[in-house]
């Protein structure tokens, strides 16, 4: 056979089988003889023979199936799970993926960091144990906030303290440290957004060490809630003012809030170097500029209180002069000490008292005088402080190194030769640090004029705690008892999120007792009361920290007087809370909610881009509500979620956190609008009545507008509904000339205890059984507060209205006059009487403060006129080339005003807007003859109707107010008989 026939075209062998070739390929090994194979008995002992036989049987049983025919479905290609993992492992088999497509099978490792936080505790010039000992064992503690206007140097002042207490801390090149600005958005925008607590140990002029628990607060006027929250648990205010800009709009509000809460003020005049290097004022003019700013602060204080204890003045020791950018802060005493340390021979206090005011120094006679004899005398402040300061600055920025070296040697300042080669600013910072050193003058001012927590305990208790002071809890708070047996009472005013933004720390002040890690406590919410204990949760303290801005000191416990961060108690807290121990003998009471300086009048609606992510949005809204004290979230009847804030900047930061930190989803945001209120401008045209559903009770009411000023007094806390009836009566008789009967008939404020509506009982005892009426008093109050919370026009709050209860007809049986009958009826009669009293809409108005050069004033006037705004005053700023313009602008027309202002003035103008008051929108909102035109702005008297229709549409309500919803048929017939025409 030919060789090519043995293979096919693919090279496969197809020839006949050859047994010889197969034997050559696979030769058979010779079988061993019996002599060659040893017996089992020789190799294996008798005791192991049984094991070997058993192993052979198992091996044979494993090999037997290899020669059997196995079906395809019975073949085993891989070992079973039991063979791989063992028989002790539970194995589950899932044939369908239970994870959604949006969730990866293997989750990536996410490091969500929203803030700068030091993982390792940095080195300090003091031991941490020493700091904790000061906080817990002594009264050498001061708790205060650092407040002021935007970019006036609050964070820089605390940076100055951080530089000297944290030796390893160095600022970035060509930038300030901003140690308390930990949020990434704060560092990106170069402005503080959140208040940040910082705890330090510092020494005064005598070397005594104090523990400072200071809180850096934002300066932007939109974030005044971050000022009010820590102020509620602080003992004083350090007010920072730029000497060139002077007292600004936010400074004024902070002063007012501090004086109303009886808090001492320490004034820091910052950026003194700008008078020398920028304005280049002569020393005598610089003195007048400094004095003018101090007088401006005192004028604002006097408008609130005439008490001299709040006055600030350098000779009193509560005014500091600083340039935080150059690294110095001094008082008259600390500067006088620099002279005495070099020359000696005089008392510091006596010398410092002669360094301010119209006191002159005669260099020839070396004596002080109250007036200059020849007219050429120099004030002592100018001679001893400003002139050396001017020399120090001017010589440093000049290139005369030898002259500077000679001048510095007179101050006993010796620098290295390479230091003279530095740029002017670093060189000036180095020289000022060598000359002034640690700001002991600032420490002295704070420790002398801001009381310790123990000294201030009685004042804080009287202002914040609503419980009885003569109880065991009240006495413990007054004494600031630190005993372990004392009742634990803490006040939470702020929530700070963790670095990953998943949880929150509760920022609290311990008023009495001791708190320990793992302790079981009761968390009482803002709505807690002895009658309604629903807003109370039992929790365990998971973590206790001493806040230090970028790091936290974890401790096992804290005592009364300390400000601490608490972990594990935030789940039930929305804004503020009271924390008490779970085994109190007396009934616990809560601390008052925070009285803020502004209102949330700016509103947007949000929704998720992907509707399936609504749960994430709701969770994010809950977290933003915790993080921002003045934010309010609400769900309208249309289902949309609305957020209320103070302004554009506030809302921008809140929405940034909502998108990137708390929900991590894409959201859609509506155009911003303003919040409205409802009011009445006339008395009800007829007595309005409403019957209960069972037709056995009738309530009659009349509405009239409140006198001007009452609403402001209620909101500012000048009158409180919880006062005794006699005290409330005396207040209205004295301030508003109410008669005795009217002033003693006040039942409630609405919609809450600080609401600007009043419910009065004007029924006569001859017509109404007062005992029966008192049995339904609480029901009528609830209906009144419900009605004033959600008005009939567009479901907004009613404001400045006096509701007078004229007549009540009640069923004699208690079962027929229960809450289910009286509450909705009281609400209906509030609405019907309100709608017959010329109802109107009210809109919020911003106070605008613009700083700009004189040539920008015409542009500012034009921009304000386009937005229904008007100028109140424009005045020049003393000692600066700027003008100050104060104006009013409606909130709904303010969107984009700041951007337009900067564009049209090429960035020369700077403005701040803050809520000022409510004003009535022109026009009748119920006038059906007005038809809003699409795509055209409403003008004049059409505004009210336009706002009403668009607001009701947005909320999912019908366009017009329904008559049958609020008026009984009998009431409608009575209106027709009286000739009253309702435009409903």
From Swiss-Prot:
Residues 139-402 form the tr-type G domain. One of its GO terms (cellular component) is pericentric heterochromatin. One of its GO terms (biological process) is mRNA splicing, via spliceosome. Residues 371-373 are annotated as: G5. It is found in: Cytoplasm; Nucleus. Residues 1-28 are annotated as: Disordered. Residues 190-194 are annotated as: G2. GO terms for molecular function: GTP binding; GTPase activity; U5 snRNA binding. Residues 216-219 are annotated as: G3. Residues 270-273 are annotated as: G4. Component of the U5 snRNP complex required for pre-mRNA splicing. Binds GTP. NCBIfam families: small_GTP (TIGR00231). This is Pre-mRNA-splicing factor cwf10. It comes from Schizosaccharomyces pombe (strain 972 / ATCC 24843) (Fission yeast). The gene is cwf10.
